[in-house]
Amino acid sequence: MLNIFFGITVSVFIAAVTLHTVGTFKDIRILKNISKPFLIFSILISHALIIVSYLPDSSLLLIYGSLALFFALAGSTLFMLKDKTFKIIAVPFFILSIISKLLVTFPSFRLYRFPILVSILFAVLYATGAAVPFLIFIKKKSAIISAAYAVMILSIGTYTYSAVLSFFGELRIYTIFLFMDSLSMVFAAFVKAKKETEELSSPLLDFISIMACTASQIFFAAGSVMMQAL
C-alpha cells in the first residue's frame, strides 16, 4: 500500500513540475497556476506516508498525524484562494500543522532509540522543514529568509550527528534518505531566499527551487517507506 502511495506521489510531482516548467519558460500563467494544487496535493500525500508507517507503534501518533494533515490541507486550500483575507487566515492553519508535526515526530524518533537530544533536533527540524514547501509560494522575504537559515542550521547539525550515530545500524538507509531530504529543503529555501533578497527575476531560479522542493518530498516519502519496512 505504501508503495502505491509513493508511486502516486512521484507521478503527481512529475506532472506538476512538468506543467510548472513549461508554464515558466513559455510564460503561460495558467499552467503555473494549475501546477500549484498538484504540488500541494503531493506534499500532503508524502506527509501521509510517514504517518501511515507509524501506525503499528502508537495510536497517539495517528491522532497527531491526522491533525497535521488536516491543518495542512485547510491552510493550503485557503492559501490557494485569490482573496488576501483567506491567505492571512491560512497562516494559523500552517502553524497548527507544524505544531502537530512536531508532536508526531518527537515520539516517533524516540521509539527508534535515538538519543533525546537527537530526537528533539529531528522534531524541530521537521517542524521547520514542513513549512518550507509552502513558503516557496509566499512572497514575504522575511519568512523565506528565516525558514532558509533555520532549516540550514538545524539540518547541518542534526543530520551530521544522527548519520554518525546510526551509520552502522539498521537506520542507515533511512538516515541517508532524510539527509537528502534535508539538503533538498535547504537548497530550495536558499535559492528562493537569494532570489527574493536580490530581487532576481529568472525562470531558471524558479525551476531550480521547485525541483529541489520536489526532490525533498520524494526523498521524504522514500524514507517513510524505508522506515515502515524496518
Predicted features, each with a name:
Residues 1-230:
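Polytopic alpha-helical membrane-helix bundles and their juxtamembrane interface segments
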